Amino acid sequence: MKKRHILLLCWGLLAFTSCEKAFMDHPVSSDPGSTFEYLWNKVNEQYAFFDIKGIDWDSVHRVYQPMLQEGMDDERLFNLCAAMLNTLRDGHTNLISNFNISRNDSVYYKMVAEKNIDTDVVLLNYLTLDYHSTGGFSHNAIRDGQVAYLRLSTFENAIDDATLKYLMDRYKNCKGMILDLRQNGGGLVSNVKEMLSIFDNHGQPLYRTQIKSGPGRDDFSELFTVLADTTCLLDHPYRKPVAVLIDRGSYSATSFFSVCTQAYDNILLFGDYSGGGLGLPNGGELPNGWTYRFSITRTIANDGGNYENGVPPDVRVLLDPDLTAQGIDNVIETAADWILSKN
C-alpha cells in the first residue's frame, strides 16, 4: 500500500505540477548569515543531482560563505545566494524576492547557442505559409502529403483530447508523423500523459522515479515505476512510425516526453541531446521571506539511464549549415526518410 501511495504522489506531481510551480515550507530565522546557511543546508539535504552533475556542495560553501559581510544589503545578499544556486546548473532552480528572480542563465544560453533548428526554414519550406494552427500545434503535410509534420514549441498550455483527435483524423492517410519539439522549453508535465494517450498503451513502464527523502547525499526513496495508461484516446492506437525531433532547447516536460518514448516501438528520437531537466522542483521560504526552489526528484529511464543532463536521441542529426542556407532542414529530411522507409 505504501508503494502505491508514493507512486500516486509522484504521478500526481507530474500531473498537476508545471515546470514553474513551487511548494512552500515555513521560515525559522532572520539575519543574512542565517538566511545563507539555511539555503545552503536545504540544498545540501534535498537536492537530487549532486552526483550526476559532479558538484562538490561543500566546496561551494567554502567559496561563497566568506563573501558574506556584516551589514550586507538585500540586493547584495540576493546576488550572493543566487550565484551559489547557479553553480547547480539547473534550470529548475530559482531564488525569488520582491525585487528580483534569479535564473540559471548558463542553462538558457546553452539552449539558445546549441539550438538545432532554423525556424525560418521550418516556416517557409516545411510548414509553408498555408499551415494550420490547432491547440498550440502548427502543422501541415510534407513529402507530397505522405508525412504529417506537427510543430509544438511549448508545453505551457494544456493539450486536450479534441485537439489530438482532430490531428490524428486530419493526417490519418499519412504514412507517419514528425513531432517537432525542438526548442520546446517545457511547461505542463501533465501534457506528457495526454500526448502519450494516442499510442498503444497497455500499462507498460514509462520510467522510474525517486524522491530525495533524507539529509544524506544518498538518501532517496526506493525507485517507483510510473506506468502508461491501459487505454487509448483513439478507437485504434496510432502505430505508424513517429519521429520526435529534439535539441538542447527541449527541456523539462519535453525531456520527460522524450524519456517516455522508450516505451513505444514505433517512436524514435531524432536530432540532438535534449536539455535535460528531469527533476521535479520543490521549494520553501527563507528566514527573510524570500522563496526558493530546486529539483528534489530524479528520473531513471527504461534503459537505466539518468538523463538529467540531456536525453540522447536515437538518431543524432545536427543541422548542416550548407543545407540550411539552401532552405533544407536535414533533421526533418532524415526523419521523413526513416518514416517512408518503414512503409
Model-derived features with residue positions:
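C-terminal "post-core" interaction segments
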Residues: E20-E37, E75, G176, G185-N343
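Alpha-helix termination/capping residues and helix-transition junctions
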Residues: L13, Y171-N173, H236
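Bacterial Sec-dependent N-terminal signal peptides
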Residues: M1-V28
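Flexible, low-complexity junctional segments that flank or bridge functional domains
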Residues: C19-K212, D219-T225, P241, S341
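Short beta-strand-initiation
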Residues: R4, T134-G136, G279
